[in-house]
Amino acid sequence: MWIIEAEGDILKGKSRILFPGTYIVGRNVSDDSSHIQVISKSISKRHARFTILTPSEKDYFTGGPCEFEVKDLDTKFGTKVNEKVVGQNGDSYKEKDLKIQLGKCPFTINAYWRSMCIQFDNPEMLSQWASNLNLLGIPTGLRDSDATTHFVMNRQAGSSITVGTMYAFLKKTVIIDDSYLQYLSTVKESVIEDASLMPDALECFKNIIKNNDQFPSSPEDCINSLEGFSCAMLNTSSESHHLLELLGLRISTFMSLGDIDKELISKTDFVVLNNAVYDSEKISFPEGIFCLTIEQLWKIIIERNSRELISKEIERLKYATASNSTPQKIIQPQRHIQKNIVDDLFSVKKPLPCSPKSKRVKTLENLSIMDFVQPKQMFGKEPEGYLSNQSNNGSAQNKKSGDNSEKTKNSLKSSSKKSANTGSGQGKTKVEYVSYNSVDKGNSSPFKPLELNVVGEKKANAEVDSLPSENVQESEDDKAFEENRRLRNLGSVEYIRIMSSEKSNANSRHTSKYYSGRKNFKKFQKKASQKAPLQAFLSLSEHKKTEVFDQDDTDLEPVPRLMSKVESIPAGASSDKSGKSSISKKSSNSFKELSPKTNNDEDDEFNDLKFHF
């Protein structure tokens, strides 16, 4: 703002503040907001006109004065500024000191610029006070500049000290609040005649420091208080950088979170972060690095022993890191190891899942025979009656399924004994499924391993699908259900037991030329002569050679090309919806017709053991 004063008594011995506006200077005018009276008979009644322009945005950063325009009002002796005559149209001046001589007046008027640039910490407060302060000739802004003389602190309830306030305190800027601005606007009329009535901002600053415990006692106690320490910081604010420089720190900056140089940070004593970017989940620093925000650092600075506090914290973190450090586990890449597929399939130690892509986890309590007979289909709808037991069923459902499975087991055991007795007497060919109950109930595995049961052996937990009575008539619904019930090739192994009558055992020597090369042929032949009718297990390769079953390629997809799929139940077998299969007399005759076609027309009593994948 511009202030004028003069030697002698031409201005009544007072200094006056010139706010932006127009003033008429003469000996016959009154002193008010638009006139300046000069007591001298050597000047005209209306001698000159002074005009003060409002400050510009550039003036806030330069601290330069507002334009001072002087125009002579056609006087006899004219007007001089800095010993130069003012032109007829007037002249404007940007100097900070002006010496104005009016006509033949023996005294000069001295005009000088008092710089006052106010910085705001809050944009809302800036928009509220900017226009009023500009009318007083005071430039305002948000950014720090070398010309800033006053800093308006935000004193809202619950607000903490900001980085701008810290920096303003350390560089000895006068800190004020909105109460000072209100008082400044009310004394405008009174300070026109006497500039000494201008409110003192230092008194306001002292009151703020005295009543606020977030400030140190003086800026001198904080400047260079951390000299000798080094820190790293994110280069987001110039005020933060200047603040740390005033504290005496050696600063290493990184431009962004992705540009963090851990080797550079490991050489520093601590890391300083702004609150705006502080996020422990996004920023990861090496162990033993002391990280803190600027607000936390300022709280340490307030204490008189700030150097000792920081040194102790750094030593504590380094000691904790050295004592608790454990080598990080290096994750080795998994190498592909070839496994013996046969051992994985037939080993009792490694249970097989129901299907290769199945993610269902079944407990032993929810496990039933139907789960193995009818696995979930990969494509199409599930067959009716299929039990899909999930692992998250309630205890009531588990109990109910357990009771049903017990009833099914008892019925299967009784029917199995009857079918075995009738089959051996009448010479029927019987098909049985492999028992899946070889896993103990205490086993924690959700899948049961597959196991072969030799006919004639008695096991405590054996489960065999029984053959229903021959009087059951096959209906169209049963045939449709049977077609949907048959196993699809989802990667599990299926065993079908082929038993022949004692009469057909006599002809086994004629068919030995097809199976004598098998390793287990003599073993099964020996067991069959002692305990039960002869059994044979035909592999997939032998099945292709003998052409026992017709290949149906329509049902092979999406089965892997290295495997093949055959029907789980021979033609002629019927089943009801409870999962029980039966073979009539007609089916036994048709089953014998499936023997290999040779010149001797020999029967194939051994049928096949089919491997499904």
Curated annotation (Swiss-Prot):
Residues 574-592 have a biased composition (Low complexity). Keywords: Chromosome, DNA damage, DNA repair, Nucleus, Phosphoprotein, Telomere. Its main location: nucleus. GO terms for biological process: DNA double-strand break processing; DNA repair; double-strand break repair; double-strand break repair via homologous recombination; double-strand break repair via nonhomologous end joining; mitotic G2 DNA damage checkpoint signaling; mitotic intra-S DNA damage checkpoint signaling; telomere maintenance. Residues 400-409 have a biased composition (Basic and acidic residues). GO terms for molecular function: chromatin-protein adaptor activity; damaged DNA binding; molecular adaptor activity; phosphorylation-dependent protein binding. Residues 107-186, 228-302 form the BRCT domain. Changing residue 27 to A: Strongly decreased ability to recognize and bind phosphorylated proteins. Residues 23-86 form the FHA domain. The modification Phosphoserine is found at residue 355. Component of the MRN complex, which plays a central role in double-strand break (DSB) repair, DNA recombination, maintenance of telomere integrity and meiosis. The MRN complex is involved in the repair of DNA double-strand breaks (DSBs) via homologous recombination (HR), an error-free mechanism which primarily occurs during S and G2 phases. The complex (1) mediates the end resection of damaged DNA, which generates proper single-stranded DNA, a key initial steps in HR, and is (2) required for the recruitment of other repair factors and efficient activation of tel1/atm upon DNA damage. Belongs to the Nibrin family. This is DNA repair and telomere maintenance protein nbs1. It comes from Schizosaccharomyces pombe (strain 972 / ATCC 24843).
